[in-house]
């Protein structure tokens, strides 16, 4: 299970501080999710926190 950030990312940075496992970081043009680290917030929240705060709705299942 993992998520990814699509090219629609606006580089707003809302998602990065929401990740409890620090799987989100700034790429060159968009934020990226380390798919090997992403847990979709299992054990931390009922649903992925980054998805809830993304204004561009660009965080999807990998």
UniProtKB/Swiss-Prot annotation:
Positions bound to [4Fe-4S] cluster 1: 9, 12, 15, 54
Disulfide-bonded cysteines: none
Cofactor notes: Binds 2 [4Fe-4S] clusters.
Listed Pfam families: Fer4
Chain ranges of the 4Fe-4S ferredoxin-type domain: 2-28, 29-62
Top-level taxon of origin: Bacteria
Keyword Metal-binding part of the UniProt annotation: yes
MF GO annotations: 4 iron, 4 sulfur cluster binding; metal ion binding
Cofactor(s) the record lists: [4Fe-4S] cluster
Sites where the protein binds [4Fe-4S] cluster 2: 19, 38, 41, 50
UniProt keyword list: 4Fe-4S, Electron transport, Iron, Iron-sulfur, Metal-binding, Repeat, Transport
Function field: Ferredoxins are iron-sulfur proteins that transfer electrons in a wide variety of metabolic reactions.
Protein name: Ferredoxin-3
């Amino acid at each position: 299970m993992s998520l990814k950030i699509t090219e629609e990312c606006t580089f707003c940075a809302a998602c990065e501080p929401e990740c409890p496992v620090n799987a989100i970081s700034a790429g060159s043009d968009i934020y990226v999710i380390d798919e090997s680290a992403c847990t979709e917030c299992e054990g931390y929240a009922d649903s992925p926190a980054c998805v809830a705060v993304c204004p561009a709705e660009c965080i999807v299942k990998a």
